[in-house]
């Protein structure tokens, strides 16, 4: 089923944005014009955003929007708040297929989650799991599915596996991969809003991390006095990773992702679950009113990494570094282990 209208892309449309869907042969390609959020329709390699990666992948018979008969489901990989993920096949390749759960109490939340994943078709980056296709938005009531590249197990599974090493070198590498994904996403004006180990896929062949699950993502506007593109407070991620300003009901910014990123880094360091066994309401009150954070280990012997963690989960939005600042520090870290604390000196700005 081809994706023929711009209505399906309404979440990314604005007065100055025009998003068009065109066809090249039998491949649907998305072009974004006059957009302040998407400056070009091609990535740095000259590939159209909507095209699948070219690693032995034949696009010729694949569409951005598909019917239920165009893919198959073979087995369950896992499940989450808004659906289950299955192993499947699409265009002759093994893929991950996410089924969006239709919540009877809040159907609009399910629809918006699917719409956010649909819009992720536009995102193309080596550290982001590619969304290859979706069922059409108009077919939501008969079953909503998102088809993604299959990469491997998630970071949460690695954290939970005592046989999997998370050495300082590997932690740093994973931290770099994740922040590259966030830097790209934020540069497109989008906050992920559900950054956590379960949403980071680690390629079993290359050991490269890729950010997944954009079901909570929102286009945001940074700056004082400017609200987010749309208010969806019930789609702001998992509470233990949620930034305090979101717990207060404030509009999200990209700095909310930095807070969640900090908790994710903490989890790689400790291999523990944040606030495990604690009452949710007590934790939320503690995070918001008392600056409660997960406990750092006393003998981790990784001061620079702990410095990064604590800077990322600062209570004030303005005190957290940006993804660009963290990316620069981590890239320099590979050459000079003394750079990180200096590069992440406290910066004050606009909340």
Curated annotation (Swiss-Prot):
Active site: 194 (proton acceptor)
Binding-site list for ATP: 77-85, 98
Catalytic activity: L-seryl-[protein] + ATP = O-phospho-L-seryl-[protein] + ADP + H(+); L-threonyl-[protein] + ATP = O-phospho-L-threonyl-[protein] + ADP + H(+)
Molecular-function annotations in GO: ATP binding; MAP kinase kinase kinase activity; protein serine kinase activity
UniProt domain Protein kinase: residue ranges: 71-340
Keyword GTP-binding part of the UniProt annotation: no
Keyword annotations: ATP-binding, Kinase, Nucleotide-binding, Serine/threonine-protein kinase, Transferase
Residue ranges of coiled coil: none
GO biological process, one term: female gamete generation
Enzyme Commission number(s): 2.7.11.1
Organism superkingdom: Eukaryota
Record-linked InterPro entries: Kinase-like_dom_sf, Prot_kinase_dom, Protein_kinase_ATP_BS, Ser/Thr_kinase_AS, Ser/Thr_Kinases-Pseudokinases
PROSITE patterns per the UniProt record, alphabetical: PROTEIN_KINASE_ATP, PROTEIN_KINASE_DOM, PROTEIN_KINASE_ST
Function: Suppresses the mitotic cell cycle in oocytes, forcing them to undergo meiosis II to produce haploid gametes. Acts as a MAPK kinase kinase (MAP3K) that acts upstream of MAP kinase in oocytes.
Family: Belongs to the protein kinase superfamily. Ser/Thr protein kinase family.
Protein name as it appears in the record: Serine/threonine-protein kinase mos
Gene for this chain: mos
């Amino acid at each position: 089923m081809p994706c023929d209208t711009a209505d399906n892309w309404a979440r990314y449309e604005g007065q100055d944005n025009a998003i068009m869907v065109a066809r090249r042969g039998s491949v649907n390609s998305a072009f974004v014009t006059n957009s302040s959020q998407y400056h070009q329709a091609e990535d740095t390699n000259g590939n159209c955003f909507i095209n699948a990666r070219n690693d032995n992948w034949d696009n010729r018979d694949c569409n951005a929007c598909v019917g239920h008969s165009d893919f198959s489901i073979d087995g369950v990989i896992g499940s989450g708040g808004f659906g289950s993920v299955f192993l499947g096949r699409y265009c002759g390749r093994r893929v991950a297929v996410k089924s969006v759960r239709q919540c009877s109490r809040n159907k609009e939340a399910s629809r918006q989650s699917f719409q956010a994943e649909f819009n992720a078709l536009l995102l193309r980056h080596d550290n982001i799991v590619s969304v290859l296709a979706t069922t059409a938005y108009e077919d939501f009531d008969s079953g909503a599915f998102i088809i993604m590249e299959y990469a491997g197990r998630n970071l949460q599974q690695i954290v939970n596996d005592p046989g999997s090493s998370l050495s300082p070198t590997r932690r740093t590498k994973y931290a770099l991969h994740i922040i590259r994904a966030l830097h790209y996403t934020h540069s497109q004006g989008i906050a992920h809003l559900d950054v956590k180990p379960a949403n980071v896929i680690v390629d079993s062949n290359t050991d490269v991390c890729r950010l997944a699950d954009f079901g909570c993502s929102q286009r945001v506007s940074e700056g004082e006095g400017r609200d987010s593109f749309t208010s969806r407070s019930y789609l702001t991620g998992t509470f233990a990773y949620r930034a305090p300003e979101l717990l207060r009901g404030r509009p999200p910014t990209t700095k909310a992702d930095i807070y969640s990123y900090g908790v994710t880094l903490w989890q790689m360091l400790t291999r523990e679950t944040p606030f495990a066994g604690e009452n949710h309401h007590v934790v939320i009150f503690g995070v918001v009113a008392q600056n409660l954070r997960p406990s750092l280990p006393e003998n981790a012997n990784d001061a620079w990494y702990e410095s990064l963690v604590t800077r990322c989960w600062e209570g004030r939005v303005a005190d957290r570094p940006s993804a660009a600042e963290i990316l620069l520090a981590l890239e320099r870290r590979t050459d000079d282990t003394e750079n990180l604390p200096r590069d992440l000196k406290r910066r004050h700005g606009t909340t």
